[in-house]
């Protein structure tokens, strides 16, 4: 069953980045947190989960015993994906949300955290909308605003909603998945060139800030499209790469393949 939640503003208080890592309190800002002595299921939350990369990552982490929270806009599709994963023995649930509504996204992640177990791995990988991939001189203010909401406000809300738990238990992983415009702007794709650059800066700052607390933040750059059967860009290959990034916990940026001279992007 897909879980649906309306936008809810979280309680006022310090942000997760302002909170020291503690090991002796039962809750943070009203949300229950397990003590370090209590056994618990580790959950990966995949924001932008679909039949391609999202499903492959869910299976890869699910094989290792992780519960999987699948977040997407389309209720029917995420419900079907969750059912398929459950049939394979993976503890998966679908959650309907919109990354352009930061309050709703944050609340949905909090509900997944409370229902499935602590979210200790967050993957932010929704495919950009077509309006974000217009040429520079055709890109409007509304187009740019949508891209920023999608790629900056969404990640900010998602990270802050799970970071309290990660800092409390003293570990966590945040994985960003981007196209080639994250590192090389392309006038043909103005929206993602602007917003992915900002997301990359945010992710790099998170990496540098949270590394001393064993919270690993990393970015996978996939130049061009995800391609089934491709030796480096097949969904299962990319899922293995993301698993390795989670377990190795070393470098910030990983390229799925070398950058071509011409940047290409994929959209929904």
Give the residues covered by each predicted segment.
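Catalytic loop of short-chain dehydrogenase/reductase
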Residues: 128, 141, 147, 173-198, ...
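Rossmann-fold cofactor-recognition segment
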Residues: 85-103
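A short, exposed helix-loop element centered on a Lys and neighboring polar residues
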Residues: 159-160, 204
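Catalytic Tyr-X3-Lys loop
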Residues: 137-156
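Conserved glycine-rich Rossmann-like NAD(P)H-binding loop of the short-chain dehydrogenase/reductase
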Residues: 66-79
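C-terminal helical subdomain
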Residues: 204, 212-268
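Conserved glycine-rich cofactor-binding loop
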Residues: 50-51
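Active-site loop of short-chain dehydrogenase/reductase
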Residues: 118-119, 166-179, 214-215
């Amino acid at each position: 069953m897909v879980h649906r939640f309306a936008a809810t503003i979280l309680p006022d208080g310090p942000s997760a980045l302002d909170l020291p890592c503690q090991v002796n309190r039962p809750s943070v800002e009203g949300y229950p947190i397990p003590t370090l002595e209590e056994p618990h299921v580790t959950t990966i939350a995949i924001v932008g989960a679909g039949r391609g990369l999202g499903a492959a990552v869910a299976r890869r982490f699910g094989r290792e015993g992780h519960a999987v929270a699948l977040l997407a806009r389309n209720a029917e599709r995420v419900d079907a994906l969750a059912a398929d994963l459950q049939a394979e023995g993976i503890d998966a649930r679908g959650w309907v949300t919109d990354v352009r509504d930061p309050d709703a996204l944050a609340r949905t992640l909090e509900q997944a955290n409370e229902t499935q177990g602590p979210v200790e791995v967050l993957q932010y990988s929704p495919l950009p909308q077509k309006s974000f991939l217009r040429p520079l001189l055709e890109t409007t203010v509304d187009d740019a605003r949508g891209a920023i909401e999608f790629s900056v406000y969404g990640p900010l809300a998602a990270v802050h909603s799970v970071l309290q738990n990660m800092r409390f238990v003293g570990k966590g992983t945040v994985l960003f998945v981007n196209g080639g415009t994250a590192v090389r702007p392309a006038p043909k794709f103005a929206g993602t060139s602007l917003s992915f650059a900002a997301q990359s800066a945010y992710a790099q700052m998170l990496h540098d800030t949270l590394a001393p607390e064993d919270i690993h933040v990393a970015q996978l750059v996939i130049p061009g499209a995800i391609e089934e059967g491709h030796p480096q860009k097949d969904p299962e290959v990319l899922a293995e790469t993301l698993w390795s990034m989670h377990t190795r916990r070393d470098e910030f940026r990983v390229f799925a393949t070398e950058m071509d001279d011409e940047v290409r992007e994929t959209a929904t």
